[in-house]
Swiss-Prot record:
Subunit-level organization: Heterodimer, composed of an alpha and a beta subunit derived from a single precursor.
Protein name: Lectin DB58
GO terms of molecular function: D-mannose binding
Family under the similarity heading: Belongs to the leguminous lectin family.
Signal peptide: 1-22
Keyword match Glycoprotein: yes
Amino acid sequence: MASSTVSVVLSLFLLLLTQAYSADIQSFSFKNFNSSSFILQGDATVSSSKLRLTKVKGNGLPTLSSLGRAFYSSPIQIYDKSTGAVASWATSFTANIFAPNKSSSADGIAFALVPVGSEPKSNSGFLGVFDSDVYDNSAQTVAVEFDTFSNTDWDPTSRHIGIDVNSIKSIRTASWGLANGQNAEILITYNAATSLLVASLVHPSRRTSYIVSERVDITNELPEYVSIGFSATTGLSEGYTETHDVLSWSFASKLPDDSTTEPLDIASYLVRNVL
């Protein structure tokens, strides 16, 4: 994602960004992917320098019942149990979903924070991230889903962006119009001072934008160290398929300490120094 695009996202949504004290920065940026930097699970591969999360046939069309996950190879510390400090973080990525039949696309892609060593979870509507639509603290998983199929047991009636906390049943959703086969520019931020998780998505080709936010106390929901990355699934019934590609990805996080009192805006840092 170009830094100018992220700047547009920031100005459009006027995100409430962190004012926590500065400290060590964990950051990375991929404009071309290589398998050595990732833990690839299920059907996920690195293909033509992009993350291809679900299986594609030789003719480029997606397959049924595919599940793939890709996580950054190094754990990320998101809080410090000994001091109580909590990290603010921001991530941006460009994703592309293509459904041969847009009216029957399934199932979606998620950005997820999971326990280190986590294995793929249930297929189809669970997006490979969860096993249940009932809250379960032992899952220790927070995700932002970009859901292309409405599962009547737990989803709203339309495609949506959702914030998921230890369950596939989102605690907050916003309707989302899929721009089929078009790139989506996504920015997700977490403000440790307010516990506010914000996800925004822009389709530059259509000049459409979407945003969802909710407060999440990650110290109650996640382990101290997590793996971060992506998970995606396709449907189980004929015709309910789509491709899921991540074309670029950047991340920055900041865990406060007492060595400095100068505020740092983590999302601005991401734009200036990582992208």
